[in-house]
Amino acid sequence: MARIVAANDDDSMELNTISSIHDSTLGQLLKNVSDVRKMAIGDETPVHESLNQDYNDGYMRTVPFVLSFDNLTYNVSVRPKLDFRNLFPRRRTEDPEIAQTARPKTKTLLNNISGETRDGEIMAVLGASGSGKSTLIDALANRIAKGSLKGTVKLNGETLQSRMLKVISAYVMQDDLLFPMLTVEETLMFAAEFRLPRSLPKSKKKLRVQALIDQLGIRNAAKTIIGDEGHRGISGGERRRVSIGIDIIHDPILLFLDEPTSGLDSTSAFMVVKVLKRIAQSGSIVIMSIHQPSHRVLGLLDRLIFLSRGHTVYSGSPASLPRFFTEFGSPIPENENRTEFALDLIRELEGSAGGTRGLIEFNKKWQEMKKQSNRQPPLTPPSSPYPNLTLKEAIAASISRGKLVSGGESVAHGGATTNTTTLAVPAFANPMWIEIKTLSKRSMLNSRRQPELFGIRIASVVITGFILATVFWRLDNSPKGVQERLGFFAFAMSTMFYTCADALPVFLQERYIFMRETAYNAYRRSSYVLSHAIVSFPSLIFLSVAFAATTYWAVGLDGGLTGLLFYCLIILASFWSGSSFVTFLSGVVPSVMLGYTIVVAILAYFLLFSGFFINRNRIPDYWIWFHYMSLVKYPYEAVLQNEFSDATKCFVRGVQIFDNTPLGELPEVMKLKLLGTVSKSLGVTISSTTCLTTGSDILRQQGVVQLSKWNCLFITVAFGFFFRILFYFTLLLGSKNKRR
């Protein structure tokens, strides 16, 4: 797909756009956007007033927040490598060396990390790969399971609860996980629908998105699709800013970012950090990991923490770096990038015999000296119009001043002399039906712009139906016709499930988007499951009708219109249960390749135990449970009953009894003589027109006697709901997005 806005590649134009708004806070930017729109369309209601934001001469006086963390320690168990010697228990116990190497080892990823930062600041965590940067960000963002992380994380001196943190914070992952066929504006609008409350009118949500687009400096790319390998879209720097915009749409108090400048050139990286600086100035605490900032990026940072193999080797402002390393004995040259010099020195020390132990100890002494000399006192909120507020009251006051649009509802209390607020913190910004509606709309919009995906599915169903129709063309009611009908039904019903395997990559492609959005309560997991089912169902109806119309009359199936209706219903139920089963597996398997392997294997077992290859009465007792778990069994038995339920219809008459046997090759005269001999032996008159096998007899021969066709239909549908419920629990248990 051609790029919609050709000017998006002009980074200098974007940089000028950013420079033009310079250090405007979000509140100022909203006001500017409102004024422009008011002049253009005569709107008399400023955006900042519409969002209930209180400004004084364009500047929002934010409520102060201080985030502190003390003695954060995180250890993980490292399993020993598989060794041939470890496979023998006797040798492992006899050889102390082998026994020692076989025991799991503990690796320390964070070792007593402490620090603090406040609103209006950007704190950057630096270090080489494996130093613990991302681990520290995860620890502060509550992405490490309780019990695994030691230490405390506090906001304004109060321990942060998990539910509260989800509401007031946002986390931007290192990878840009976006829907490729949505435009930038649509992507941010859907984020606004999720994170902003229903009480905010849609018109004001749109203005919020437009203001954010201007703040991010991506106005020229607003109508451009995100793009992927097959569709040209926005640039890497723009994708990164869109990813940030998704998570700051509700103006969070805490913003965590994992290497937001990774993979970007110096200009794009500077523009991204420039955006983060304005976010911080709007009253947020911004904490990010960064690999190697340029000189310009360093000028935007307020606090630095250097890590080396889980230890703090420096904590302080960028301005204090030269003095720190001078006192350590390694002065930074004048024209040298401070952070590059520090990182290079740390790498050299890590490769030396003593490691960074000396630098770690020096940092501890240096921090103590600064505290004793009172040069760096602990951060405390400055004087503000909100003294002595609890954390919830401070958050409520911050909401009333314009922060955290979806974070809660501040409720004023008090009389003439008091102006305190309390906070009602909702777990989610919107009710479930709004979430389902928004999720469904987004999924359908993304799918509608990729019609080739549905086209491939319906083409495969129609082609398969056409092949079956030509192979099993107009089957008669002879014994051969009965046998061919059984083969057609077995293959047709299994085809429904194999076709559903195409749905496997859908959730696997969306998995990390889902994990990012649900990690901070953008929507409920149950809403996603219901939306997923709602969006997929219409396509299943089209597939069912297409297959039924292609095969029903061509094969010569019986039952008339009522038989056709049931045939369509059981095919639809098969598609439903098959897609639900594949959807459940997509929540379990880690990759598409493994998923396809498992789906093909399990569906083969379902077909084996369906009753076509081996009668139910012949299945061993230790495998009979698989017969009842087979998804192919119930649709197969249902279509058999739909075809052979007429007890008056005959399928074997007179000499046809010899068909499908060696005697079937005899001349008709010989068959009649044999039939007469059999009649005399049995004492029953059997003529050439005597009906010997009806549809009911065929059902009994196939062992289809336990359930009616409607019961089989209901069980097939129930299997679909069962696997959707299992899918929900896999999301609930498997998408905690936390380290163990």
UniProtKB/Swiss-Prot annotation:
A GO cellular-component term linked to this record: membrane
Chief place where the protein resides: membrane
Molecular-function GO term, any one: ATP binding
Gene source species: Arabidopsis thaliana (Mouse-ear cress)
PROSITE patterns to which the protein is assigned, alphabetical: ABC_TRANSPORTER_1, ABC_TRANSPORTER_2
Recorded family membership: Belongs to the ABC transporter superfamily. ABCG family. Eye pigment precursor importer (TC 3.A.1.204) subfamily.
Record membrane topology: Multi-pass membrane protein
UniProt protein name: ABC transporter G family member 1
Annotated ATP binding sites: G127, A128, S129, G130, S131, G132, K133, S134
